[in-house]
Amino acid sequence: MAGRNEPPNALRHDLRRGEIIWVLKQDYPHLVTFRHLQLALRDRNIPLSERDLVSYLSYLEEGSYVRCVRRFDESDSLERILAAALTARGILLLDNKLTDAGVRF
């Protein structure tokens, strides 16, 4: 159960996606490595596991708000996200010219 000052789960996920877009905006249009993004979010008091960050980036990528560079890791038989960059559509979302119910700022 969420504490008094914690937003409900759905809202928390929406806000985290918004924070990811905000962090990527700082380096637009350049790529930000996965680890750098993870550390930048941690500096903003949003520590995310690799699995959670992949989930958020995948959601944002499906909406064409971010572009992810991936590599297949043969040792784990998994595709890993190496870096991400904000797209022009992501800028429009950040500037409130587009709306997405799953992203809040």
Predicted segments — roles?
Residues S77-E79:
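Short acidic/glycine-enriched loop/turn segments that link adjacent beta-strands
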Residues E61-E74:
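A short, conserved structural fragment
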Residues M1-L31:
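Short alpha-helical segments that sit at the start of domains
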Residues P47-G63, I81:
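Short amphipathic alpha-helical interaction segments
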Residues I81-F105:
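Short, amphipathic alpha-helical interaction segments positioned at domain boundaries
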Residues A2-R4, V23-Q26, L39-A40, I46-R51, ...:
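Exposed, interaction-prone assembly regions rather than primary DNA-binding/catalytic cores
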Residues H30-L41:
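Short acidic, hydrophobic short linear motifs in intrinsically disordered regions
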